[in-house]
Amino acid sequence: MLNAVGRDIPEEILELTGKEVFHGNHYYDGYEYKKDGPKTKCVINSNGSKLVDSIHDALVKCGIKDGMTLGFHHHFREGDYIVNMVMEEVHKMGIKDITICASSLGKAHDAIVPYIEDGTITNIQSSGVRGKIGEAISTGKLKGLAIMRSHGGRVRAIETGETRIDIAFIGTPTCDDYGNCRGIGGKSDCGVLSYAMVDGDYADKVVAITDCLVPFPNFPAHISMTKVDYVVEVDAIGDPKKIATGAAKPTTDQRKLMMAEYCTQFVVNSPYFKDGFSYQTGVGGASIASTISLAKIMKERNIRMRFGVGGLTKPMCDLLINNQVDCLLDTQDFDLSAVESVKNLKHFRISAGEYADPFNKGAVVNKLDFVILAALEVDVHFNCNVVVGSDGVITGAQGGHPDTAAGAKCSIVIAPLLQGRIPAICTDVTTVTTPGESVDVVITDYGIAINPRRQDLIEAMKDVDLPFKTIEELRDIAYSITGEPEKVQFGDRVVGVIESRDGTIMDVVREIKPFEFAED
Protein backbone atom coordinates (compact mmCIF):
# COMPACT_ATOMS: atom_id res chain seq x y z
CA MET A 1 0.00 0.00 0.00
CA LEU A 2 1.37 3.41 -0.98
CA ASN A 3 1.88 5.92 1.82
CA ALA A 4 2.05 9.72 1.82
CA VAL A 5 5.69 9.76 0.67
CA GLY A 6 5.03 7.31 -2.15
CA ARG A 7 6.60 4.26 -0.51
CA ASP A 8 4.91 0.92 -1.11
CA ILE A 9 4.51 -0.82 2.24
CA PRO A 10 3.92 -4.60 1.92
CA GLU A 11 0.56 -5.82 3.22
CA GLU A 12 2.26 -8.60 5.19
CA ILE A 13 4.24 -5.99 7.15
CA LEU A 14 1.07 -4.02 7.90
CA GLU A 15 -0.58 -7.21 9.13
CA LEU A 16 2.46 -8.35 11.12
CA THR A 17 2.89 -5.02 12.92
CA GLY A 18 -0.77 -3.99 13.09
CA LYS A 19 0.27 -0.62 11.67
CA GLU A 20 -1.10 1.87 9.19
CA VAL A 21 0.92 3.50 6.43
CA PHE A 22 2.18 7.06 6.95
CA HIS A 23 -0.57 9.57 6.12
CA GLY A 24 1.25 12.82 6.85
CA ASN A 25 2.65 14.64 9.86
CA HIS A 26 -0.66 15.75 11.35
CA TYR A 27 -2.68 12.57 10.90
CA TYR A 28 -2.95 11.92 14.66
CA ASP A 29 -3.28 15.55 15.76
CA GLY A 30 -5.99 15.72 18.45
CA TYR A 31 -6.06 11.94 18.95
CA GLU A 32 -6.97 10.88 22.51
CA TYR A 33 -5.80 7.69 24.23
CA LYS A 34 -5.20 6.23 27.69
CA LYS A 35 -1.57 5.79 28.63
CA ASP A 36 -0.20 2.39 29.58
CA GLY A 37 1.28 1.71 33.01
CA PRO A 38 3.85 -0.67 34.50
CA LYS A 39 3.43 -3.38 37.08
CA THR A 40 4.52 -1.89 40.40
CA LYS A 41 5.64 -3.78 43.51
CA CYS A 42 4.74 -2.21 46.85
CA VAL A 43 7.77 -1.97 49.16
CA ILE A 44 6.66 -1.39 52.75
CA ASN A 45 8.73 -3.81 54.81
CA SER A 46 12.22 -3.05 53.47
CA ASN A 47 15.74 -3.73 54.69
CA GLY A 48 16.69 -0.28 53.43
CA SER A 49 18.79 -1.37 50.47
CA LYS A 50 18.13 -2.52 46.93
CA LEU A 51 21.70 -3.64 46.28
CA VAL A 52 22.20 -7.06 44.73
CA ASP A 53 25.51 -8.80 44.12
CA SER A 54 25.57 -8.98 40.33
CA ILE A 55 23.75 -8.50 37.06
CA HIS A 56 23.03 -12.23 37.15
CA ASP A 57 21.28 -11.87 40.51
CA ALA A 58 19.28 -8.91 39.23
CA LEU A 59 18.15 -10.91 36.19
CA VAL A 60 17.05 -13.80 38.40
CA LYS A 61 15.17 -11.52 40.80
CA CYS A 62 13.47 -9.81 37.85
CA GLY A 63 12.30 -13.18 36.51
CA ILE A 64 14.15 -13.11 33.20
CA LYS A 65 12.71 -15.55 30.67
CA ASP A 66 12.46 -16.23 26.95
CA GLY A 67 10.61 -13.64 24.88
CA MET A 68 11.15 -10.65 27.14
CA THR A 69 11.83 -7.06 26.08
CA LEU A 70 14.84 -5.37 27.67
CA GLY A 71 15.32 -1.60 27.71
CA PHE A 72 18.59 0.36 27.45
CA HIS A 73 19.67 3.98 26.95
CA HIS A 74 22.60 5.32 24.94
CA HIS A 75 23.87 8.25 27.01
CA PHE A 76 27.27 6.56 27.22
CA ARG A 77 27.36 6.51 23.41
CA GLU A 78 30.45 4.77 21.99
CA GLY A 79 31.76 4.23 25.52
CA ASP A 80 28.79 2.14 26.69
CA TYR A 81 29.46 -1.14 28.53
CA ILE A 82 25.95 -1.81 29.84
CA VAL A 83 24.31 -3.50 26.84
CA ASN A 84 27.20 -5.91 26.34
CA MET A 85 27.44 -6.80 30.05
CA VAL A 86 23.74 -7.52 30.38
CA MET A 87 23.42 -9.46 27.14
CA GLU A 88 26.50 -11.56 27.91
CA GLU A 89 24.82 -12.69 31.14
CA VAL A 90 21.48 -13.27 29.40
CA HIS A 91 23.30 -15.44 26.85
CA LYS A 92 25.08 -17.44 29.57
CA MET A 93 21.70 -18.17 31.16
CA GLY A 94 20.47 -19.68 27.88
CA ILE A 95 17.65 -17.15 27.45
CA LYS A 96 16.32 -16.80 23.89
CA ASP A 97 14.02 -14.63 21.78
CA ILE A 98 14.92 -11.33 23.45
CA THR A 99 13.77 -7.99 22.06
CA ILE A 100 16.18 -5.13 22.70
CA CYS A 101 14.43 -1.78 23.01
CA ALA A 102 17.24 0.79 23.08
CA SER A 103 17.26 4.53 22.54
CA SER A 104 20.12 3.78 20.13
CA LEU A 105 22.79 1.16 19.39
CA GLY A 106 26.27 1.76 18.04
CA LYS A 107 29.69 0.31 17.36
CA ALA A 108 30.20 -0.13 21.11
CA HIS A 109 27.70 -2.96 20.89
CA ASP A 110 29.32 -5.00 18.10
CA ALA A 111 29.86 -7.77 20.66
CA ILE A 112 26.15 -8.68 20.66
CA VAL A 113 26.16 -9.74 16.99
CA PRO A 114 26.80 -13.43 17.90
CA TYR A 115 23.71 -13.26 20.12
CA ILE A 116 21.72 -12.08 17.11
CA GLU A 117 23.08 -14.96 15.07
CA ASP A 118 22.25 -17.64 17.66
CA GLY A 119 18.73 -16.40 18.43
CA THR A 120 19.36 -14.91 21.87
CA ILE A 121 18.25 -11.60 20.34
CA THR A 122 15.52 -11.89 17.72
CA ASN A 123 14.06 -8.37 17.52
CA ILE A 124 15.50 -4.89 17.86
CA GLN A 125 13.73 -1.60 18.48
CA SER A 126 16.02 1.40 18.34
CA SER A 127 16.50 4.87 16.96
CA GLY A 128 18.99 3.20 14.65
CA VAL A 129 22.11 1.09 14.60
CA ARG A 130 25.69 1.47 13.48
CA GLY A 131 28.60 -0.88 12.98
CA LYS A 132 28.35 -4.66 12.83
CA ILE A 133 24.78 -4.75 14.18
CA GLY A 134 23.61 -2.78 11.16
CA GLU A 135 25.46 -5.15 8.87
CA ALA A 136 23.94 -8.17 10.63
CA ILE A 137 20.41 -6.81 10.22
CA SER A 138 20.93 -5.78 6.60
CA THR A 139 22.28 -9.21 5.69
CA GLY A 140 19.30 -11.00 7.22
CA LYS A 141 20.85 -12.39 10.41
CA LEU A 142 18.18 -10.97 12.74
CA LYS A 143 15.32 -13.49 12.85
CA GLY A 144 12.64 -10.89 13.52
CA LEU A 145 12.35 -7.21 12.64
CA ALA A 146 14.42 -4.15 13.41
CA ILE A 147 12.02 -1.28 14.11
CA MET A 148 13.62 2.16 13.89
CA ARG A 149 11.91 5.00 15.74
CA SER A 150 12.74 8.62 16.45
CA HIS A 151 13.46 9.66 20.02
CA GLY A 152 9.93 10.98 20.34
CA GLY A 153 8.56 7.90 18.62
CA ARG A 154 10.21 5.60 21.18
CA VAL A 155 8.49 7.42 24.03
CA ARG A 156 5.18 7.21 22.17
CA ALA A 157 5.54 3.47 21.61
CA ILE A 158 6.28 2.83 25.29
CA GLU A 159 3.64 5.05 26.84
CA THR A 160 0.88 3.77 24.55
CA GLY A 161 1.72 0.17 25.51
CA GLU A 162 2.72 -0.75 21.98
CA THR A 163 6.11 -1.65 23.45
CA ARG A 164 6.13 -3.10 26.95
CA ILE A 165 9.59 -3.16 28.54
CA ASP A 166 9.85 -6.10 30.93
CA ILE A 167 13.21 -5.10 32.43
CA ALA A 168 15.00 -1.77 31.94
CA PHE A 169 18.71 -1.50 32.66
CA ILE A 170 19.70 2.06 33.47
CA GLY A 171 23.40 2.75 33.52
CA THR A 172 23.88 5.65 35.90
CA PRO A 173 27.10 7.55 36.71
CA THR A 174 26.08 7.82 40.37
CA CYS A 175 23.49 5.97 42.41
CA ASP A 176 22.75 5.30 46.06
CA ASP A 177 21.80 1.89 47.43
CA TYR A 178 18.10 2.73 47.15
CA GLY A 179 18.12 3.60 43.45
CA ASN A 180 18.37 7.38 43.15
CA CYS A 181 20.16 7.89 39.82
CA ARG A 182 22.09 10.91 38.57
CA GLY A 183 23.98 11.57 35.33
CA ILE A 184 26.80 13.42 37.08
CA GLY A 185 29.17 13.01 40.01
CA GLY A 186 31.06 9.84 39.11
CA LYS A 187 33.93 8.66 36.93
CA SER A 188 31.61 7.99 33.95
CA ASP A 189 29.64 11.24 33.82
CA CYS A 190 27.24 11.62 30.90
CA GLY A 191 25.42 14.73 32.14
CA VAL A 192 21.77 13.72 31.85
CA LEU A 193 19.66 10.54 31.71
CA SER A 194 16.86 11.90 29.54
CA TYR A 195 16.37 8.87 27.28
CA ALA A 196 16.14 6.52 30.27
CA MET A 197 13.37 8.43 32.02
CA VAL A 198 10.60 6.75 30.05
CA ASP A 199 12.14 3.35 30.86
CA GLY A 200 12.02 4.25 34.54
CA ASP A 201 8.40 5.35 34.24
CA TYR A 202 7.02 2.41 32.25
CA ALA A 203 9.22 -0.70 32.62
CA ASP A 204 7.83 -3.48 34.82
CA LYS A 205 11.24 -3.93 36.46
CA VAL A 206 14.06 -1.37 36.63
CA VAL A 207 17.70 -2.19 37.40
CA ALA A 208 20.15 0.65 38.05
CA ILE A 209 23.77 -0.21 37.22
CA THR A 210 26.52 2.09 38.50
CA ASP A 211 30.28 2.25 39.02
CA CYS A 212 29.98 4.97 41.66
CA LEU A 213 27.84 4.06 44.64
CA VAL A 214 27.23 7.11 46.84
CA PRO A 215 25.54 7.57 50.22
CA PHE A 216 21.76 8.00 50.37
CA PRO A 217 20.17 10.34 49.29
CA ASN A 218 21.69 10.95 45.84
CA PHE A 219 19.62 14.09 45.30
CA PRO A 220 18.37 15.73 43.24
CA ALA A 221 17.72 12.44 41.48
CA HIS A 222 17.37 12.36 37.70
CA ILE A 223 15.55 9.03 38.04
CA SER A 224 13.92 8.44 41.41
CA MET A 225 14.27 5.51 43.80
CA THR A 226 10.49 5.13 43.48
CA LYS A 227 11.03 3.71 39.98
CA VAL A 228 13.98 1.37 40.72
CA ASP A 229 13.74 -2.27 41.84
CA TYR A 230 17.40 -3.26 42.14
CA VAL A 231 20.84 -1.64 42.16
CA VAL A 232 24.03 -3.31 40.90
CA GLU A 233 27.54 -1.94 41.44
CA VAL A 234 30.10 -2.88 38.76
CA ASP A 235 33.71 -1.90 38.08
CA ALA A 236 32.89 0.27 35.06
CA ILE A 237 29.72 1.23 33.20
CA GLY A 238 31.57 2.81 30.31
CA ASP A 239 34.74 4.29 28.89
CA PRO A 240 34.74 7.96 29.96
CA LYS A 241 36.94 8.94 27.00
CA LYS A 242 34.26 7.71 24.61
CA ILE A 243 31.23 8.89 26.60
CA ALA A 244 32.17 12.54 26.25
CA THR A 245 34.77 13.31 23.62
CA GLY A 246 36.29 16.51 24.98
CA ALA A 247 35.56 19.95 23.55
CA ALA A 248 33.88 19.83 20.16
CA LYS A 249 36.38 21.48 17.85
CA PRO A 250 35.40 23.90 15.09
CA THR A 251 36.00 22.42 11.66
CA THR A 252 38.81 23.63 9.42
CA ASP A 253 37.27 21.98 6.34
CA GLN A 254 36.64 24.83 3.89
CA ARG A 255 33.61 23.12 2.38
CA LYS A 256 31.96 22.73 5.78
CA LEU A 257 32.85 26.31 6.71
CA MET A 258 31.20 27.53 3.51
CA MET A 259 28.00 25.59 4.26
CA ALA A 260 28.07 26.90 7.83
CA GLU A 261 28.29 30.48 6.56
CA TYR A 262 25.41 29.87 4.12
CA CYS A 263 23.38 28.48 7.01
CA THR A 264 24.13 31.42 9.30
CA GLN A 265 23.26 33.96 6.61
CA PHE A 266 20.00 32.17 5.88
CA VAL A 267 19.07 32.13 9.57
CA VAL A 268 19.83 35.82 10.19
CA ASN A 269 17.93 36.90 7.06
CA SER A 270 14.85 34.84 7.90
CA PRO A 271 11.77 36.30 9.61
CA TYR A 272 12.34 34.11 12.69
CA PHE A 273 15.69 35.64 13.65
CA LYS A 274 14.71 38.17 16.28
CA ASP A 275 15.08 38.72 20.00
CA GLY A 276 13.81 35.66 21.86
CA PHE A 277 14.26 33.09 19.07
CA SER A 278 14.88 29.39 19.81
CA TYR A 279 17.42 27.10 18.22
CA GLN A 280 18.75 23.55 18.01
CA THR A 281 21.74 22.29 16.12
CA GLY A 282 23.68 19.06 15.76
CA VAL A 283 27.19 17.87 16.50
CA GLY A 284 28.59 17.91 12.94
CA GLY A 285 31.40 20.22 11.88
CA ALA A 286 29.23 22.55 9.80
CA SER A 287 26.58 22.73 12.53
CA ILE A 288 29.14 23.65 15.20
CA ALA A 289 30.70 26.26 12.92
CA SER A 290 27.30 27.80 12.19
CA THR A 291 26.58 28.13 15.92
CA ILE A 292 29.90 29.92 16.45
CA SER A 293 29.31 32.36 13.58
CA LEU A 294 25.70 32.91 14.66
CA ALA A 295 26.88 33.88 18.15
CA LYS A 296 29.02 36.66 16.66
CA ILE A 297 26.08 38.14 14.76
CA MET A 298 23.84 37.85 17.82
CA LYS A 299 26.39 39.89 19.76
CA GLU A 300 26.72 42.50 16.99
CA ARG A 301 22.95 42.97 16.71
CA ASN A 302 22.25 42.62 20.44
CA ILE A 303 19.87 39.70 19.85
CA ARG A 304 19.35 37.11 22.58
CA MET A 305 18.24 33.53 22.19
CA ARG A 306 15.38 32.57 24.50
CA PHE A 307 16.34 28.89 24.70
CA GLY A 308 18.63 26.40 23.03
CA VAL A 309 17.84 22.70 22.76
CA GLY A 310 20.07 19.67 22.43
CA GLY A 311 22.00 17.26 22.07
CA LEU A 312 24.40 19.95 23.33
CA THR A 313 28.00 20.83 22.52
CA LYS A 314 30.46 23.46 23.75
CA PRO A 315 29.39 26.25 21.35
CA MET A 316 25.80 26.07 22.60
CA CYS A 317 26.98 26.03 26.22
CA ASP A 318 29.25 29.01 25.50
CA LEU A 319 26.12 31.00 24.63
CA LEU A 320 24.94 30.41 28.20
CA ILE A 321 28.32 31.35 29.70
CA ASN A 322 28.36 34.54 27.60
CA ASN A 323 24.79 35.45 28.58
CA GLN A 324 23.51 35.19 25.00
CA VAL A 325 20.79 32.64 25.78
CA ASP A 326 18.33 32.57 28.67
CA CYS A 327 18.48 28.81 29.22
CA LEU A 328 19.38 25.45 27.70
CA LEU A 329 17.07 22.43 27.52
CA ASP A 330 19.16 19.27 27.51
CA THR A 331 18.45 15.70 26.42
CA GLN A 332 22.02 14.59 25.66
CA ASP A 333 25.57 15.85 26.12
CA PHE A 334 28.09 15.32 23.34
CA ASP A 335 31.25 16.68 24.96
CA LEU A 336 32.84 17.41 28.32
CA SER A 337 31.85 21.07 28.19
CA ALA A 338 28.19 20.12 27.90
CA VAL A 339 28.49 17.64 30.78
CA GLU A 340 30.10 20.32 32.95
CA SER A 341 27.47 22.88 31.92
CA VAL A 342 24.71 20.74 33.47
CA LYS A 343 25.77 22.25 36.81
CA ASN A 344 24.66 25.71 35.60
CA LEU A 345 21.32 26.66 37.16
CA LYS A 346 20.00 27.77 33.76
CA HIS A 347 20.94 24.48 32.09
CA PHE A 348 17.85 22.30 32.48
CA ARG A 349 17.60 18.57 31.88
CA ILE A 350 14.41 17.45 30.14
CA SER A 351 13.08 13.98 29.36
CA ALA A 352 12.88 12.58 25.84
CA GLY A 353 9.11 12.86 26.21
CA GLU A 354 9.25 16.55 27.07
CA TYR A 355 11.64 17.00 24.17
CA ALA A 356 9.92 15.25 21.30
CA ASP A 357 6.99 12.93 22.11
CA PRO A 358 4.21 13.52 19.54
CA PHE A 359 1.65 11.77 21.75
CA ASN A 360 1.71 14.10 24.74
CA LYS A 361 0.04 17.48 25.19
CA GLY A 362 2.84 19.40 23.54
CA ALA A 363 6.62 18.85 23.36
CA VAL A 364 9.56 21.28 23.21
CA VAL A 365 10.12 20.64 19.50
CA ASN A 366 6.82 22.40 18.81
CA LYS A 367 8.33 25.62 20.23
CA LEU A 368 11.49 25.59 18.10
CA ASP A 369 12.12 28.37 15.61
CA PHE A 370 15.19 26.82 13.97
CA VAL A 371 16.67 23.36 13.81
CA ILE A 372 19.89 22.61 11.93
CA LEU A 373 20.15 18.98 10.80
CA ALA A 374 22.28 16.72 8.61
CA ALA A 375 21.38 13.89 6.23
CA LEU A 376 22.96 11.06 4.26
CA GLU A 377 20.64 11.75 1.33
CA VAL A 378 17.99 14.31 0.34
CA ASP A 379 15.79 13.78 -2.70
CA VAL A 380 13.98 16.18 -5.02
CA HIS A 381 10.87 15.82 -2.85
CA PHE A 382 12.94 17.01 0.17
CA ASN A 383 12.62 13.58 1.81
CA CYS A 384 15.66 12.78 3.97
CA ASN A 385 17.47 9.53 4.69
CA VAL A 386 19.55 9.37 7.86
CA VAL A 387 19.55 5.61 8.50
CA VAL A 388 20.56 3.59 5.41
CA GLY A 389 23.88 4.06 3.62
CA SER A 390 24.40 4.24 -0.12
CA ASP A 391 25.29 0.52 -0.03
CA GLY A 392 21.91 -0.37 1.50
CA VAL A 393 23.37 -1.19 4.92
CA ILE A 394 21.77 0.29 8.04
CA THR A 395 24.36 2.70 9.31
CA GLY A 396 22.67 5.56 11.15
CA ALA A 397 19.89 6.62 13.47
CA GLN A 398 16.75 8.72 13.25
CA GLY A 399 17.50 10.38 16.58
CA GLY A 400 15.46 13.54 16.91
CA HIS A 401 15.65 14.29 13.16
CA PRO A 402 11.98 13.64 12.28
CA ASP A 403 10.77 15.14 15.57
CA THR A 404 12.57 18.46 15.30
CA ALA A 405 12.01 18.81 11.56
CA ALA A 406 8.27 18.37 12.09
CA GLY A 407 8.12 20.78 15.02
CA ALA A 408 10.41 23.67 14.08
CA LYS A 409 9.19 26.71 12.17
CA CYS A 410 12.30 26.52 9.98
CA SER A 411 14.06 23.19 9.52
CA ILE A 412 17.39 23.40 7.73
CA VAL A 413 19.30 20.36 6.47
CA ILE A 414 23.01 20.75 5.74
CA ALA A 415 24.54 18.17 3.42
CA PRO A 416 27.47 18.26 1.01
CA LEU A 417 26.39 17.79 -2.59
CA LEU A 418 28.56 14.67 -2.76
CA GLN A 419 29.39 12.17 -0.02
CA GLY A 420 32.69 11.01 -1.51
CA ARG A 421 31.61 10.01 -5.03
CA ILE A 422 27.99 9.45 -4.02
CA PRO A 423 25.40 12.18 -4.71
CA ALA A 424 23.74 13.29 -1.47
CA ILE A 425 21.10 15.14 -3.48
CA CYS A 426 19.26 12.59 -5.61
CA THR A 427 16.01 11.76 -7.37
CA ASP A 428 14.80 9.38 -4.66
CA VAL A 429 16.43 8.59 -1.34
CA THR A 430 17.24 4.97 -0.59
CA THR A 431 15.02 5.04 2.50
CA VAL A 432 12.73 7.81 3.77
CA THR A 433 13.20 8.66 7.43
CA THR A 434 12.05 12.29 7.49
CA PRO A 435 9.29 13.31 5.05
CA GLY A 436 9.77 16.25 2.71
CA GLU A 437 6.82 18.08 4.21
CA SER A 438 8.97 18.58 7.34
CA VAL A 439 12.04 19.97 5.56
CA ASP A 440 12.12 23.65 4.65
CA VAL A 441 15.66 24.32 3.43
CA VAL A 442 18.55 22.24 2.09
CA ILE A 443 22.03 23.80 2.19
CA THR A 444 24.89 22.31 0.19
CA ASP A 445 28.32 23.51 -0.86
CA TYR A 446 26.91 24.13 -4.35
CA GLY A 447 23.83 26.10 -3.37
CA ILE A 448 20.68 26.37 -1.29
CA ALA A 449 17.23 25.00 -2.11
CA ILE A 450 14.03 26.15 -0.39
CA ASN A 451 11.08 23.78 -0.35
CA PRO A 452 8.41 25.16 -2.73
CA ARG A 453 5.89 24.57 0.08
CA ARG A 454 7.56 27.51 1.84
CA GLN A 455 6.71 30.38 -0.47
CA ASP A 456 6.98 32.69 2.56
CA LEU A 457 10.67 31.82 2.93
CA ILE A 458 11.25 32.14 -0.81
CA GLU A 459 9.72 35.63 -0.68
CA ALA A 460 11.75 36.58 2.40
CA MET A 461 15.00 35.56 0.67
CA LYS A 462 14.41 37.12 -2.76
CA ASP A 463 16.90 39.97 -2.19
CA VAL A 464 19.42 38.01 -0.10
CA ASP A 465 22.81 37.40 -1.71
CA LEU A 466 23.00 33.64 -1.37
CA PRO A 467 23.37 30.97 -4.12
CA PHE A 468 19.76 29.81 -4.35
CA LYS A 469 18.88 26.96 -6.68
CA THR A 470 16.04 24.52 -7.06
CA ILE A 471 16.50 21.10 -5.53
CA GLU A 472 16.36 19.63 -9.04
CA GLU A 473 19.22 21.88 -10.13
CA LEU A 474 21.32 20.66 -7.22
CA ARG A 475 20.51 17.05 -8.14
CA ASP A 476 21.50 17.71 -11.75
CA ILE A 477 24.83 19.24 -10.73
CA ALA A 478 25.58 16.20 -8.58
CA TYR A 479 24.71 13.79 -11.38
CA SER A 480 26.78 15.79 -13.88
CA ILE A 481 29.83 15.18 -11.69
CA THR A 482 29.32 11.53 -10.77
CA GLY A 483 26.71 10.23 -13.17
CA GLU A 484 23.39 8.88 -11.97
CA PRO A 485 24.15 6.17 -9.40
CA GLU A 486 22.98 2.60 -9.78
CA LYS A 487 20.16 1.73 -7.41
CA VAL A 488 21.01 -0.49 -4.46
CA GLN A 489 19.96 -4.07 -5.11
CA PHE A 490 17.74 -5.46 -2.37
CA GLY A 491 16.19 -8.86 -1.87
CA ASP A 492 12.52 -9.48 -1.11
CA ARG A 493 12.73 -9.98 2.65
CA VAL A 494 11.92 -6.98 4.85
CA VAL A 495 14.43 -6.80 7.70
CA GLY A 496 13.59 -3.37 9.08
CA VAL A 497 10.73 -0.92 9.46
CA ILE A 498 11.12 2.86 9.55
CA GLU A 499 8.35 4.19 11.74
CA SER A 500 7.08 7.72 11.53
CA ARG A 501 7.12 9.48 14.88
CA ASP A 502 3.36 8.81 15.17
CA GLY A 503 3.87 5.05 14.74
CA THR A 504 2.67 4.72 11.16
CA ILE A 505 5.05 3.17 8.64
CA MET A 506 7.25 5.56 6.69
CA ASP A 507 9.33 2.96 4.84
CA VAL A 508 10.80 -0.52 5.03
CA VAL A 509 14.38 -1.76 4.78
CA ARG A 510 15.02 -4.91 2.79
CA GLU A 511 17.83 -7.43 3.00
CA ILE A 512 20.69 -6.49 0.71
CA LYS A 513 22.01 -8.83 -1.93
CA PRO A 514 25.36 -8.86 -3.71
CA PHE A 515 25.60 -6.22 -6.43
CA GLU A 516 25.16 -7.47 -9.97
CA PHE A 517 26.32 -5.35 -12.88
CA ALA A 518 23.72 -4.82 -15.59
CA GLU A 519 24.61 -6.34 -18.94
CA ASP A 520 24.77 -4.07 -21.99
Residue ranges of model-derived segments:
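Conserved alpha/beta enzyme-core scaffold
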Residues: 1-520
